[in-house]
Amino acid sequence: MPHKVLVVDDSKLARMVIASAFRRIRPEWTLVESVNADEALTMVSGGAVDIALIDFNMPGIDGLELVARIRKTYPAMPVAVVSANIQDEIIGRARELNAGFIPKPLTDDALAAFLSGAALRLKKVAT
């Protein structure tokens, strides 16, 4: 079943890298992009997003705060924090929020593993 994936990153280059990998891995799924947390929250609240990939370092609301806000309304949505900042504290906070963590630079294998797990999780929720 095709899903809609939201990529939230203030860096156009980072969004392009993720989009390129995404199209190689899941060409049948839909990818939508957001440049900041406020825009992402609007998109998520519309209910049209199944999965989210969220950058940690963004102006205003950071990625972990965005995950926390999404969790309040959509506790089962598969979410991953995508960041070059691989400090244990950040990875730990992501896990506390029941979010995955994908290090940058992004690899196809890491993205594929997360998306496969997300698809299984959504399938379980639907049944």
Task: Give the predicted meaning of each segment.
Residues 58:
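Receiver (REC) domain active-site loop signature in two-component systems and cognate sites
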Residues 12-32:
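Two-component/phosphorelay signaling modules centered on CheY-like receiver
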Residues 8-9, 34, 52:
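Conserved sequence signature across two-component system core domains
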Residues 65, 86-102, 113:
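Alpha4 helix (beta4-alpha4-beta5 surface) of REC/receiver domains from two-component response regulators
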Residues 55:
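Active-site residues of response regulator receiver
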